[in-house]
Amino acid sequence: AAHTGEEYQQEPTKEQIQLATRLTASPDVDMVYCHHSHVVQPWAKVNGKLVIYGLGNLVGNQPSSMPRTHEGVVGRVTFGVKSGKASLSRAEYVPVYIGSPSEGPIRIHAVNAELSSGRGSRARLKETRRQVSRTVRSLGVSGVSER
C-alpha cells in the first residue's frame, strides 16, 4: 500500500504511475494499492500485476462541495498459488455510496445490493455505479468484474 496521489483528482498522477511501475517490476510485489485521493481512481495492470490507484472514501466525511467524494469502491482480490508463486486469481469491485450526515448516521451503501432491493435513491445509486465503473475501467483494466 502506498499513500500517494493528488487529493480529489480521479486520474493517477505521474508519481503514482512511476511508483506503480517500479513496485510491480519487483518479483516480491504481487499487487499495488494506493490511497490518498479521496475519490475513486482507475485500476490497471502494470507489468502484469494489478494496481488499484484509489478506492475513494469509506470513512471520511468530505465536504459536499468536493465532487465525487461520496463515491467509493470496496476491492475484493483473491490470490492463489501457481508454480509456487502467489498469483491473482480474482479481482472484483463493489461500488459504494457514502451517505451524507444530513441523512442521519453516515452509512456506506453497497450500490448494487440497494438497487436490487429497491432501497435508496435509484437515480443517485445508478449515477454512482455508472461513475465508479467508468473510472475503475478508464485505463482499460482487464480481468476485473463488478460485484
Question: Where does each model-flagged region fall?
Answer:
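A short C-terminal boundary segment appended to hydrolase-like catalytic domains
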Residues: P67-R147
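Active-site beta-loop-alpha junctions enriched in small/polar residues
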Residues: H3-T4, H38, G56-L58, V94-V96
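Conserved beta-sheet core of the metallophosphoesterase superfamily
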Residues: P12-G75
